[in-house]
Amino acid sequence: MTAPLRIPRRLAAQCRTSPEHQAWLACLPDRVRELATRWAVTLASPFDTDETSAAWVAPGTRADGSPVVLKVALPHMEGRDEIAGLRFWDGSPTVRLIEADDSLGAMLIEQCRPGTALRSRPEVEQDTIIASLLHRLWRQPSEGHGFRPLAEMTAFWTAETTSDRDQWHDDGLVAAGLELLRELPNTGGTAVPLATDLHAGNVLRAQRQPWLMIDPKPFVGDPAYDATQHLFNCRPRLHAHPAVTIDRFSDLLGVDAERVRLWMFARAAAEPRDDWSDPELLSLARKMAP
């Protein structure tokens, strides 16, 4: 008798939010078994952390003994082009893509060893390492790369936030954030491929290179945007010294600190969320307001 597939708790919770996600989850056990057979992988238990909410991810070993990771992504707007991004960056500075099934959002990637997340290091060290990774990510794509413009993601967010208007706690703050979400993607100068979700939890210690990035969500747009996710993960420092924190990281990246601040404000004020009364985000938005 085949053992039931273990489903990480955060992924299970996410799949309860829509019928489409529930249908995806119902098909997942058969898909994982078929992929493991097709790619000759013996799987261990899946990762079950606070960050495994948008994919089923498990370490494994191939028939030749090589360590790998199988990832089957939950379909969502921001992560649609992850496989294309891994192909584009081709292992530098991302993990290597070994096999993929684009139609299933499934990928077999190299396993980082020891795999310790960068978040275990002091934040000032995180700043330097993430800045160096972003400099390597921001390379000019070839013609026909297929990555969507950043404006497509911010338009998606704007529509979701607008649909929640009756839940807003500060109409003026949200309206100002929405205005910037419409404006900033079209005023950033040279557009480059962006990771859009690069933070210290998505950077792992490895052997092939000291640090490798996982989970890219590529779009093309303003490089100043790519500063935001790491900064949002540095909440105590950002609350205590917002200007100093933003200026330091912007200087490491070589991007305009004012544009980073505007992106941070726009996201804190108007990015979609479950709780529009979140006091931490309201406080951050007010501290960074133009």
Segments and roles (model prediction):
Residues T2-R6, R10, T116-G172, A191, ...:
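A cross-family kinase active-site recognition segment
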Residues F47, E51-R62, V69-L70, L97, ...:
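Active-site acidic catalytic loop and adjacent metal/ATP-binding pocket
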Residues W263-M264:
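Short alpha-helical scaffolding segments that buttress acidic/His motifs in well-ordered protein cores
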Residues R205-E258:
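Active-site Asp-x-Gly
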Residues M1-T94, A206-P210, K287-P290:
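Conserved NTP-binding catalytic cores of kinases and kinase-like/nucleotidyltransferase enzymes
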Residues A26-P29, D64-L108, C112, T116-L137, ...:
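A conserved alpha-helical element in kinase catalytic cores
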Residues R16-P19, C27, S163-D164, W168, ...:
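ATP/Mg2+ or Mg2+-diphosphate-binding catalytic cores
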Residues W24-E34, S142-T196, A206, D251:
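An alpha-helical support segment within catalytic cores of ATP-dependent transferases
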